[in-house]
Structures are given as structure tokens and as C-alpha cells.
């Protein structure tokens, strides 16, 4: 999975645990789950390693996780603006698989008219978002009528609801 600003992404976290997933005949594990705890945080991010990017031998290590959010809903934040990660209401034991992410747009890498049919005109966007504990990527289609001026720009505050998070890389420190 390619993201245009991968080198900018990073959340310092501890790789707490792994759940390897089912073994396939080719010897790889199907959809392994990893659990990352951002430094100083109490929330545990449950992430499915869809692309087998994380070395399971890194369990227990602190490192830089490069994460990209996709799917879910995106909207402009209302005052007061906030940065952070909120677990879904059904999260148990502090583990969240589809959190709400609150952040400020750092950089817009891609902004183009979308070919996806939604209920209103939309824009495809790839951007970096400061969520307080670091920068994550966002890749999605935005309904342009939901945003002032019909788009997002650096400095915009966003709320990502029930988003899926993919991991591009985990680099131990």
C-alpha cells in the first residue's frame, strides 16, 4: 500500500501484543492483529496487519508506527478543537479497533475530483493529520458540502469517526 507522505507519518508507541491469525497453506498468517499503545496513552489501538508489514518479533518493543486511516466518516470539528484518539463506545479493556480520531490537517498531498458516486459531490483526498501523539495519514472521499469552502486545507480540524487504521510500517527505536 503506497501513501504519498509515508516519511512524515509516525506515532511513537509500544507494540504490546500480537494475535497471529489463522495459518494459510502458504505458511503466512491470515489477517494478524497487533496492539499498539501510543507513548503515554491508556488506549490500545487494535490494528489488523492486512499487508503483513510488522515483524512479529518486534512484540514488546517501542517504535515508530506509520499509520493510515481510511473508510469511516470525516467531518469538520466544531469548537473547541481537539487532538486525540477516542475509543468507540463498545470498546472493552481499553482496546479500540475503530476509534474516533481528532486532528488538525498538517499537509494535503492529494486533492482531486472523485469518481466515486456518493450522495453529493465528493473529493478524493490524501493528507497527513496531527492527532496530538503524532502524524497519521488519511485516505478517503470527502463529501464537499460537509466542509467550509468545499474542501480541506492545512490547519483544518477534522473528526474521523469509526475509521479503519492500516499500518504501513513499524520501526523499532
Predicted regions mapped to residue ranges:
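Short nucleic-acid-contacting surface segments enriched for D/E, G, S/T with interspersed K/R
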Residues: 49-66, 143-161
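A compositionally biased, intrinsically disordered/low-complexity signal enriched
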Residues: 12, 45, 57-67, 97, ...
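C-terminal functional regions that serve as terminal interaction/effector modules
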Residues: 39, 130-133, 141, 148-149, ...
Amino acid at each position: 500500500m503506497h501513501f504519498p507522505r509515508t516519511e512524515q507519518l509516525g506515532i511513537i508507541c509500544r507494540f504490546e501484543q500480537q494475535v497471529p491469525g489463522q495459518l494459510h497453506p502458504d505458511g503466512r498468517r491470515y489477517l494478524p492483529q497487533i496492539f499498539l499503545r501510543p507513548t503515554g496513552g491508556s488506549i490500545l489501538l487494535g490494528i489488523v496487519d492486512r499487508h503483513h508489514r510488522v515483524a512479529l518479533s518486534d512484540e514488546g518493543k517501542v517504535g515508530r508506527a506509520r499509520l493510515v486511516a481510511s473508510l469511516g466518516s470525516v467531518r469538520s470539528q466544531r469548537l473547541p478543537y481537539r487532538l486525540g484518539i477516542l475509543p468507540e463506545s463498545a470498546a472493552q479493556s481499553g482496546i479500540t479497533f475503530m476509534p474516533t480520531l481528532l486532528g488538525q490537517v498538517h499537509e494535503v498531498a492529494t486533492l482531486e475530483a472523485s469518481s466515486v458516486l456518493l450522495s453529493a459531490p465528493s473529493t478524493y483526498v490524501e493528507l497527513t493529520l496531527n492527532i496530538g501523539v503524532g502524524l497519521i495519514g488519511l485516505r478517503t472521499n470527502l463529501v464537499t458540502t460537509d466542509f467550509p469552502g468545499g474542501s480541506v486545507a492545512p490547519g483544518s480540524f477534522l473528526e474521523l469517526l469509526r475509521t479503519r487504521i492500516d499500518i504501513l510500517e513499524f520501526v523499532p527505536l
